[in-house]
Amino acid sequence: MKIPVLDKGFVELVDVMGNDLSAVRAARVSFNMELKDEEKDRRLVEYLMRHGHESPFEHIVFTFHVKAPIFVARQWFRHRIASYNELSGRYSKLTYEFYIPPLQRFGQTRIVPEKVIEKISHVVNESYQTYMELLEAGVPREVARIVLPLNLYTRFYWTVNARSLMNFLNLRADSHAQWEIQQYAVAIAKIFREKCPWTYEAFIKYAYKGDLLREV
């Protein structure tokens, strides 16, 4: 499952271990019990979420492949209870792929948005040209990359359990977060909802503190 985000980015589900019933099994083992009928299992998911018993949800694990601007990735990596592996600018030549914001991102600027985009594009072109010139001159990749701006796209793998994923959604699928990472959070939420519908529904009903997912 792959969802386009921003102008050139995406969120792709690579792997998932477990589902709603994984949390149910983990919770019932405390009482030496197994799965019951579907309605009781679903009510247990709601009970766990409503009362803040979140550890059973750690037994549901997702791995995502994400392509995002560097400045988005740096915000993302602040969510530490997860595992990350990122494209290396030391070992790979970085591709000419930069995020250019849509016109509505510029608000009440003193110059017209089209001129802002023109200035951003000019800096991007100049920096990448300099990067390539440095590489051609024999400068190591790890040094040449320092001239590239934060809107360069990077790619990374993110492995995260459902409990930590819900924390990510609480903080990033919210209007207080930067708009760009909001778009990624909404994409993550759509995948989460598809793979764990009971958990997602209970999360939105009892534990979600943001303001973007009520209509997703």
From Swiss-Prot:
Residues 9-206 form the ThyX domain. CDD domains: ThyX. Pathway: Pyrimidine metabolism; dTTP biosynthesis. It catalyses: dUMP + (6R)-5,10-methylene-5,6,7,8-tetrahydrofolate + NADPH + H(+) = dTMP + (6S)-5,6,7,8-tetrahydrofolate + NADP(+). PROSITE patterns: THYX. Its EC number is 2.1.1.148. DUMP binds at residues 75-78, 86-90, 145, 172. FAD binds at residues 55, 78-80, 86, 161-163, 167. It is an enzyme of class 2 (transferase). The active site is at residue 172. Binds 4 FAD per tetramer. Each FAD binding site is formed by three monomers. Keywords: FAD, Flavoprotein, Methyltransferase, NADP, Nucleotide biosynthesis, Transferase. Homotetramer. This is Flavin-dependent thymidylate synthase. It comes from Thermotoga neapolitana (strain ATCC 49049 / DSM 4359 / NBRC 107923 / NS-E). The gene is thyX.
